[in-house]
Amino acid sequence: SPALADEHNDNFLRF
């Protein structure tokens, strides 16, 4: 996710 570019683990946003 662009908003979480720092932490490339946006898995928790992929609900």
From Swiss-Prot:
Top-level taxon: Eukaryota
Keywords, A to Z?
A: Amidation, Neuropeptide, Secreted
**Residues bearing the modification Phenylalanine amide:** F15
- Primary residence: secreted
Q: Does the keyword Metal-binding apply?
A: no
GO annotation, biological process: neuropeptide signaling pathway
Gene Ontology, cellular component aspect: extracellular region
Protein's UniProt keywords contain Secreted: yes
The entry's localization annotation reads: Secreted
What's this chain's function? FMRFamides and FMRFamide-like peptides are neuropeptides.
Q: Which family does it belong to?
A: Belongs to the FARP (FMRF amide related peptide) family.
Q: What's the protein called, per UniProt? A: Extended FMRFamide-12
Taxonomic lineage is:
Eukaryota, Metazoa, Ecdysozoa, Arthropoda, Hexapoda
